């Protein structure tokens, strides 16, 4: 049998390589390496809000479920129930299941340390949300940074709309809720206001998480400042809306500007809901709210997890890119078709 010439052999090899490349490019998702990622949520309890905002655990869980769709990830979900023993048990269950990576969202240093030790012993990498797990990269809210965004927005509004007029500022909401790091938010607000409006007197009013306290507390403050313009930094969106009602009830809407924190559904609305921050409502005294994006947490965390699984380096700490959402940009951040 006559052997093919070198030129023919080289041509055949080139065709074979090209075919392999084409087949590789066309591999269906089912043929790619898939990773099993466990996500242990802080809580799934209905009506319980997270991190001093209006977001709930089911919203966070849904963000992970939706974000995982385009990735080669099989998601395993756990509920830590805000309970240390449950958090440890969930980690043990994930280890028994031999997951490839564990995402831990739990408030509790001791429990997180225990979970971290168990995962390390099992050779499973971890990624922490908001509260550290020893040795794991952390994705966290930047409460102080979010507060600064709110304070700067209020100061800019005052400089633009009330230049030369006597102005006071008040931070209202669950200002002492240390477990949710709200005091960091308050410090960010007051720091920015002191830098930008050094002549404005600052006051904090603590509702202790009770929206019914907004009207009497803010009403008394407004009565004590009858001829001044009032900047109102609310620690969450529900408080911002309650503050708006309180201000309008006493006829002081022309003297006030409000910024909230969170950008949850109570303020930007679903497709069939009333929307306080909306291009059609540009004259609202709620001039904006600082986005926390907890309803999109999965979209931020899962790409980090995938990089870790592929052996890529990730930052030891990644912070939420908080942004002021106003009537001018709300449809960019939350398009109408995405308000479901």
Label every model-predicted segment.
Residues 14-24:
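Bacterial N-terminal signal peptides
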Residues 13, 33-35, 173, 193, ...:
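Hinge/cleft segment of the Venus flytrap/periplasmic-binding protein
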Residues 139-168, 184, 214-215, 264-270, ...:
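Hydrophobic alpha-helical segments within soluble ligand-binding/sensing domains
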Residues 34-68, 76-88, 106-109, 138, ...:
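Extracytoplasmic "Venus flytrap"
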Residues 51-70, 146-150, 180-200, 213, ...:
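Short, solvent-exposed amphipathic alpha-helices that sit
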Residues 79, 132-156, 172-176, 276-295:
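Short beta-strand elements at the ligand-binding edges of bilobed clamshell
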Residues 110-145, 265-277:
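Flexible loop/hinge segments that line or gate small-molecule binding clefts
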Residues 101-120, 189, 203-272:
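Hydrophobic alpha-helical
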